[in-house]
Amino acid sequence: MEASTVYYTDFRCPVGTSLTEKLRRLCIAAGIKNIDMEGKFVAIKMHFGELGNLAYLRPNYAKVVADLCKEQGGMPFLTDCNTLYPGSRKNALEHLTCAQLNGFWPMTTGCQILIADGLRGTDEVEVPVPNGEYCKTAKIGRAIMDADIFISLSHFKGHESTGFGGAIKNIGMGCGSRAGKMEQHASGHPAVQKDLCRGCHRCAKECGSDAICYNEKNKAVIDQDKCKGCGRCIGACNFDAIYALCDNANEMLDRKMAEYAAAVCNGRPTFHISLVQDISPNCDCHGENDAPILPDIGMFASFDPVALDQACADACLNAAPLPNSQLGQNLATPGWNCHHDNFKDSNPNIEWKATLEQAEKVGMGTRAYTLKKV
């Protein structure tokens, strides 16, 4: 496959030039205005940040993208799907409240917010995975698949399971419904934390497989043989008593995530933007963010999400670790087994290259790229 073009700009701002203006110029240079958006729904997929985490992208960046879409006659909306785990984004109401508390309002973003998989994370579309090796179909939030055009706006940072979180993770994991996230993270089966179960029977009423019964203490029990892994019981429980068994090895998680991302992007115009800043060692899904492991690098954009992630990863690999960080402290530990890889030296149990390998294998894009500075 021919090398893709990735556009890049740094964070330096001479007097009179703002970061939002630099992002706008980057998107235009990368070709966002070549997409026919007239009268079309445009899903802008981003992470609104868990409450307590301050590393997420500011809403001002989202407004730049939304305004560009509206200038071209598009109807943009910001979107994400509910989380698989307890937290401030596990259902649509709390998710919207979280987004608003973190500054995401129509006034600040230039468009509305839709939680793509509905109130309880069950409003999904089963989408074929092109050339899927591990997943033949992907369970994706309905509003994302209803959009005519898909744009990812990603915070590129480290990640404790996948090495880094960039465009492919934002798309693959982020667009998965609750059942989709379960399929990627696990064998697809939930479990019950008995001390939190109230015996309300709401989960059993939601289960379409008759897989939930109750023991002598009126605590839910899931029959793993009957369970189809739809995740509806997790959304049904208001007490966080049901959770997903995250038993997939990191490399399998990476590869499934890449296939999910390919399903989201297949068959329609897409555009991808990543900001490599506040490079925390872990996911923005945490209720906190540790000190950045690397200095801020810049903003990147491309029509090819695989090339985009590779370019961002390469920039991070070539950056000098910050001493007062998880990465810096690991490298300073006597006897540390140095991997000469900023992602693996921050989180040693990851296999980040598998994501890019699988994404390229299923035809989502190419790891070969040409970098053009704007």
What are these regions (language model features)?
Residues 2-53, 57-61, 71-80, 85-374:
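Extended, low-polarity segments enriched in aliphatic/aromatic residues
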Residues 66-67:
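Terminal amphipathic helices with adjacent charged low-complexity linkers/tails
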